[in-house]
């Protein structure tokens, strides 16, 4: 078992809301959270600046020997994810956008199927 911590980072403290859910699923995991409250918000900054911040934070987390980095910031996920994966190939790096999009699409597909089944049954029984 890999006992190294999981690194989380966000441009502020919003990513902290993900931690309780993760701890319920993986109660023995150690977590290092970096909230960049000194430089928030990221959304209004140049992409080059955001990439610099993201690289600095990832460097810090890697120096703490994390086994994975979770980017809990939409701005960084959308502008820096691939760059960080290339820069840190030995660390698994995941963003927040893909998992959220998959969860939404799964729920929408399930809802569509339920609605379809409901109307199909209603129409069939008329």
Which positions does each model-derived feature cover?
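Non-catalytic structural scaffold of enzyme domains
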Residues: 1-126
């Amino acid at each position: 078992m890999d006992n190294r911590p999981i690194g989380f980072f966000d441009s502020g403290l919003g990513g902290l809301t993900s931690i309780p859910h993760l701890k319920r699923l993986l109660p023995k995991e150690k977590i290092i959270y970096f909230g960049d409250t000194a430089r928030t918000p990221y959304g209004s900054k140049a992409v080059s600046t955001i990439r610099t911040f993201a690289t600095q934070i990832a460097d810090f987390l890697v120096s703490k020997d994390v086994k994975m980095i979770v980017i809990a910031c939409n701005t960084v996920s959308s502008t820096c994810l691939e760059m960080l994966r290339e820069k840190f190939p030995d660390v698994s790096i995941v963003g927040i956008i893909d998992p959220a999009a998959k969860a939404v699409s799964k729920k929408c597909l399930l809802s569509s199927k339920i609605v379809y089944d409901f109307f199909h049954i209603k129409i069939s029984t008329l």
